[in-house]
From Swiss-Prot:
InterPro entries noted in UniProt: NqrDE/RnfAE (IPR003667), RnfE (IPR010968)
Official protein name in the record: Ion-translocating oxidoreductase complex subunit E
Membrane disposition: Multi-pass membrane protein
Organism, scientific name: Aliivibrio fischeri (strain ATCC 700601 / ES114) (Vibrio fischeri)
Its EC number(s): 7.-.-.-
Cited function: Part of a membrane-bound complex that couples electron transfer with translocation of ions across the membrane.
Predominant cellular place of this UniProt entry's protein: membrane
Source organism, top-level taxon: Bacteria
Stretches that traverse the bilayer: 18-38, 39-59, 69-89, 93-113, 125-145, 182-202
UniProt subcellular location: Cell inner membrane
Family: Belongs to the NqrDE/RnfAE family.
A Pfam family assignment: Rnf-Nqr
């Protein structure tokens, strides 16, 4: 069973679902035009990931191996429906903004992948922690990409935060610089592709520098034996 430290490291960095596994790219590219949209979808994904991992782990012994995938999809779809109804009730503006990408969480490969590869093979607590940190890793990338695109495209940060957090959150809006016309490349999917590529490249550079700092093991000297 993986330790909590390993789960945190895997979810946030070593096996990040967006930057390493390259899963969930459809919502990542489509919804991350602003920090608010990115954070809203990230929270919804975390809730579904944690819930599906917990339920799959609890019932894994009673699910026949032959039908496990359809059962996992039904569990995930039920949780997504609950999250969709909650968002419709308490964050209606964000619900309209995210649109079809909320129900499309059902088809997100991150969620079904964690249910199949981890939750179905581990106890409830590790499964919940795995879902939490994988979701946090995905949300972190969503928010970073959303911040990059919103700053470059609109010159703002946390625009529309009231859609997620309520009327008080209008004070969170920051205008970094004024733009007469939006930078469309940053706001459209091509800009999202470029942003994801930049984040992946940055992660690879950091990984390489960290690897270079590690002391390298000396190769063992093989001696020929003559008899």
């Amino acid at each position: 069973m993986a330790s909590h430290k390993e789960l945190v490291k895997n979810g946030l960095w070593d096996n990040n679902p967006a930057l390493v596994q390259l899963l969930g790219l459809c919502p990542l590219l489509a919804v991350s035009a602003t920090v608010t949209n990115a954070l809203g979808l990230g929270i919804a994904t975390i809730l579904v990931l944690v819930g599906s991992n917990l339920i799959v782990s609890l019932v894994r012994q009673w699910i026949p191996q032959e039908v496990r995938i359809p059962v996992f999809v039904m569990i995930i779809a039920s949780l997504v429906t609950c999250v969709q109804l909650l968002m419709n009730a308490y964050a209606y503006g964000l619900y309209l903004s995210l649109g079809i990408f909320i129900p499309l969480i059902v088809t997100n490969c991150i969620i079904i992948g964690r249910a199949e590869s981890f939750a179905s093979k581990n106890d409830p607590l590790p499964a919940v922690l795995d879902g939490l940190w994988m979701g946090m890793g995905m949300t972190a990338v969503l928010v970073l990409l959303g911040a990059m695109r919103e700053i470059l495209g609109n010159g703002t940060l946390f625009d529309g935060a009231d859609l997620l957090l309520g009327d008080w959150a209008t004070m969170l809006r920051i205008e970094l610089f004024h733009v007469d016309s939006h930078f469309l490349l940053a706001m459209l999917p091509p800009g999202a592709f470029l942003g994801v590529g930049f984040l992946i490249a940055l992660k690879n550079v950091i990984d390489k520098k960290m690897a270079d700092r590690q002391p390298k093991e000396k190769a063992e000297i093989e001696r020929a034996r003559i008899s």
